[in-house]
Amino acid sequence: MKGCSFLRNGAKFQGKQKGVSSSTLEVHVTILHVNLAKSMLCGFIHVSYTSPNNTSLTTYFEAEIIGNRFTFETKWPEWGASEEIDNRHWKRLGALKSNGKDIPLRLIQPYDPLSRETVYMRWKELAMLDKTVDYQNHNQSFPFGISYEGFYYISFSQSTGKIKGYYYHHSEPEKVLFLELNPIIDRTFPVIEFQ
């Protein structure tokens, strides 16, 4: 699986984020930079909600690729995840199975993430890019009840480019938001003119 064409600089994905209620948000993700040597990538997440005023929110995120450098255990205490929460979310994504048995997170050995069909990641939104509304003012709510203070548990299929994930925020641990994205296939190629 080395050299996956979907996990690259400039890759784009689109899909939906669904909550426990009937609300569904349109989501577009652009990968800006992939650094496999450091097991990291970064990009933008653009969320939009079809409403009378077509509300949207764009954030910058950074990702930890699980494998050689980052483990399945969330190491950042301020993210509010515990081993139990990590287990629950990774199991939903099929990450902790071996020969049909569950494996404790602490027993999973470092591995080359690109040697497997599914790449697992944590995506953490770090900054909001939209300046139309002051969302940092605590008197105002985020559009359509979302926040960017939590993080995503992500599974990425190298063969199809499909992304699935679950959003977790420690202040709302029972709120389940499911993310599902498909790659945007760019069937164009650059035009070169020789003179």
Curated annotation (Swiss-Prot):
Belongs to the GID4/VID24 family. Keywords: Cytoplasmic vesicle, Membrane, Ubl conjugation, Ubl conjugation pathway. The keyword Cell membrane does not apply. This is GID complex substrate-recognition subunit 4. It is found in: Cytoplasmic vesicle membrane. Substrate-recognition component of the GID E3 ligase complex recruiting N termini and catalyzing ubiquitination of proteins targeted for degradation. GID E3 is regulated through assembly with interchangeable N-degron-binding substrate receptors induced by distinct environmental perturbations. Required for the adaptation to the presence of glucose in the growth medium; mediates the degradation of enzymes involved in gluconeogenesis when cells are shifted to glucose-containing medium. Specific for substrates with an N-terminal Pro (Pro/N-degron). GO terms for biological process: negative regulation of gluconeogenesis; proteasome-mediated ubiquitin-dependent protein catabolic process; protein catabolic process in the vacuole; protein targeting to vacuole. Substrate-recognition component of the GID/CTLH complex. In the absence of stress, the complex exists as an inactive anticipatory complex (GID(Ant)), composed of Gid1, the E3 ubiquitin-ligase Gid2, Gid5, Gid8, and the RING-like subunit Gid9, awaiting a substrate receptor to form the active E3 ligase complex. When cells are shifted to glucose-containing medium, the substrate receptor Gid4 is induced and becomes part of the complex, named GID(SR4). Additionally, Gid7 transforms the GID(SR4) E3 ligase core into a higher-order supramolecular assembly (Chelator-GID(SR4)). Ubiquitinated by the GID complex, leading to subsequent proteasomal degradation. It comes from Schizosaccharomyces pombe (strain 972 / ATCC 24843) (Fission yeast). It is a peripheral membrane protein. Pfam families: Vac_ImportDeg. It comes from the Eukaryota. GO terms for cellular component: cytoplasmic vesicle membrane; GID complex; vacuole. The gene is gid4. The keyword Ubl conjugation applies.
